[in-house]
């Protein structure tokens, strides 16, 4: 379906078809699920409010994606111009999470699985907060500019790639367990 503004409000939202719209506002009491064959293409802004977002689709936002979601599991392709994920309880990425501009994530628990990509065209800030927080990266976390990983109350486990291409990489953690690559200022 094609529309200018698409608003949905339901106990659960399951998207399995194709959605093309200028703006989208999805509000669910429980879950927002995008299924494997779905396409969600938003040319401007998207706002998501739910207990959890489970993305298995191609989900594109042309401008800014904001969320009031407790948990995000990205198993596919989530792309936008700018992302702010604040006050998450859990973020698990097994796919591609891409921001053309800045990417900011604040979550209690973060896991970027092997072969997963968390990419930012500019600055990428990833922080953990709360009790029982954790940071595990087995994939690729790459910022075209600066990369800040602030997990000062938790251990940072990296078996993948942490990379700031053009600027500084700042990693603050209780303990750092690195068997992967940590690279900054390569100017590639």
Predicted features and spans:
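Short, T/G/N/S-enriched strand-turn elements that build extracellular solenoid repeat scaffolds
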Residues: 1, 14-20, 34-41, 54-60, ...
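Surface-exposed loop/turn motifs in large extracellular/passenger domains
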Residues: 2-11, 22-30, 42-51, 62-70, ...
């Amino acid at each position: 379906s094609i529309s200018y503004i698409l608003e949905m409000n339901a106990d659960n939202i399951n998207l399995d078809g194709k959605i093309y719209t200028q703006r989208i506002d999805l509000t669910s009491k429980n879950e927002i699920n995008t299924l494997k064959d779905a396409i969600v293409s938003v040319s401007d802004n998207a706002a998501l409010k739910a207990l959890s977002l489970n993305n298995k689709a191609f989900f594109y936002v042309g401008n800014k994606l904001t969320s009031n979601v407790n948990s995000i599991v990205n198993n596919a392709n989530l792309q936008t111009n700018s992302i702010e994920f604040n006050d998450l309880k859990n973020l698990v990425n097994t796919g591609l999470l891409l921001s053309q501009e800045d990417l900011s994530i604040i979550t209690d628990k973060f896991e970027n699985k092997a072969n997963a990509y968390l990419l930012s065209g500019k600055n990428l800030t990833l922080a953990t907060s709360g009790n029982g927080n954790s940071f595990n990266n087995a994939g690729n976390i790459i910022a075209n500019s600066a990369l800040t990983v602030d997990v000062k109350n938790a251990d940072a486990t990296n078996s993948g790639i942490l990379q700031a291409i053009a600027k500084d990489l700042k990693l603050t953690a209780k303990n750092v367990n690195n068997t992967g690559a940590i690279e900054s200022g390569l100017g590639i």
